[in-house]
From Swiss-Prot:
FMN binds at residues 25-27, 60, 102, 171, 223, 299, 324-325. The gene is easA. Substrate binds at residues 171, 174, 352. Keywords: Flavoprotein, FMN. SUPFAM superfamilies: FMN-linked oxidoreductases. Probable inactive dehydrogenase; part of the gene cluster that mediates the biosynthesis of fungal ergot alkaloid. DmaW catalyzes the first step of ergot alkaloid biosynthesis by condensing dimethylallyl diphosphate (DMAP) and tryptophan to form 4-dimethylallyl-L-tryptophan. The second step is catalyzed by the methyltransferase easF that methylates 4-dimethylallyl-L-tryptophan in the presence of S-adenosyl-L-methionine, resulting in the formation of 4-dimethylallyl-L-abrine. Coiled coil: none annotated. This is Probable inactive dehydrogenase easA. Belongs to the NADH:flavin oxidoreductase/NADH oxidase family. GO terms for molecular function: FMN binding; NADPH dehydrogenase activity.
Length: 380
């Protein structure tokens, strides 16, 4: 049995986690055509909640119809969606675990066909495409920006007060709408929403303030990916000062946590060969401090996760490790890591099969876990 700091308890929002292994938010296309979570989703999250005291973060969830930028992604704006999510939340809570919903708006990163089929147009902070040759979005006007802020707030209320989620994570990463305002590689505005570090930060911060006012500071997290070049991001000259300012403002709001992702994407370089001294987010981790949890994501495996908490950040108990792909294929991942049990391999070909349980809910639990199935949940 592991003695790693991975298995220390951690205060988190209004709860206490039994370990530091977190399910990553992942877009898996398992909602129906109307954005209602299918029954597979309840099974998926219940499986990964089976080790008591686990933190799960959901798929990216569209906050309103205009943000449903891909087919078969879930939403949180109507009663059918909220009711389906409540079933998911209740199942996770019955296992003694916790679940936060990720609030999402795609902006220029949406699938154009998915938008046009709904009579919607591509939009962003500025008229800058994701890449040369890609469709050019239109720039949001003042009224539309204010409406987006209200939509985030309503999405948070629907999640926490309607569906019973423990909290919400604002998706400010990976080149989606909040990131499109935050980074000058996309944001070319000259009004109060662009042109300076403070103005580029305004959209994300106004969303955060509104959501905090709606559901409470200890029910709000933020995900950022400063170094990711995915979807045209991560190329601005003043990247570190931009994110230093933004993170400082988030810390002053005393939100529940910060979630940082390293640049580890299919079409990008391995982060180990990137040479910028701040690339692995240590600067931002130090800025965040030790008072509130910080989630770190970036292709971690059992060994690198242990090194992260036992060596790199051994002086703090607030660093949690986010797993995506390994959690797909190992629903009992915290149990396996604690007991030193080998991980099952994942199958990329089944990551994104719409409306299907294949590669989603059919990975088995290990024998050692099943031997304890007479317990309501396994102690984390």
């Amino acid at each position: 049995m592991s003695t790693s700091n991975l298995f220390n308890t951690v205060p988190f929002g209004k709860n206490v986690l039994n370990h530091k292994i977190v399910l990553s938010p992942m877009t898996r296309f398992r909602a129906d055509d109307n954005g209602v979570p299918l029954s597979y989703m309840k099974t998926f999250y219940a499986q990964r909640a089976s080790v008591r005291g686990t933190l799960l973060v959901t798929d990216a969830v569209a906050i309103c119809p205009r943000t449903k930028g891909f087919p078969n992604v879930p939403g949180i704006w109507n009663k059918d969606q909220i009711a389906a999510w409540k079933e998911v939340v209740d199942e996770v809570h019955s296992k003694g675990s916790f679940i936060w919903l990720q609030l999402w708006a795609t902006g220029r990163a949406a699938d154009l066909e998915a938008l046009t089929s709904q009579g919607l147009k591509l939009e962003s902070s500025s008229e800058v495409p994701v890449a040369p040759g890609e469709p050019t979005p239109r720039a949001l006007d003042e009224d539309e920006i204010q409406q987006y802020i209200l939509d985030y707030v309503q999405g948070a209320k629907n999640a926490v007060h309607g569906a019973g989620f423990d909290g919400v994570e604002i998706h400010g990463a990976n080149g989606f709408l909040v990131d499109q305002f935050l980074q000058s590689s996309c944001n070319r505005r000259t009004d109060q929403w662009g042109g300076s570090i403070e103005n580029r930060s305004r959209f994300g911060l106004e969303i955060t303030r509104g959501v905090v006012d709606a559901v409470g500071h200890d029910r709000v997290g933020m995900k950022l990916s400063p170094w990711s070049t995915f979807q045209g991001m991560g190329t601005m000259d003043d990247l570190v000062p931009q994110f230093e300012h933004f993170i400082t403002c988030l810390r002053e709001m005393d939100i529940a946590y910060l979630h940082l992702a390293n640049s580890r994407w299919v079409e990008e370089e391995d982060p180990s060969i990137r040479t910028h001294p701040d690339f692995h987010n240590q600067t931002f981790v130090q800025m965040w401090g030790k008072k509130r949890p910080i989630l770190l994501a970036g292709g971690y495996d059992p060994d690198s996760a242990r090194r992260l908490v036992d060596q790199t950040y051994s002086d703090r108990n607030n660093v949690l490790v986010v797993f995506g792909r390994h959690y797909i294929s190992n629903p009992d991942l915290p149990f396996r890591l604690r007991m030193g049990i080998a991980l099952q391999k994942y199958n990329r070909d089944t990551f994104y099969i719409p409306c299907s349980g294949e590669g989603y809910v059919d990975y088995p639990f290990c024998k050692e876990y099943l031997d304890q199935a007479d317990e309501a949940a396994v102690a984390g």
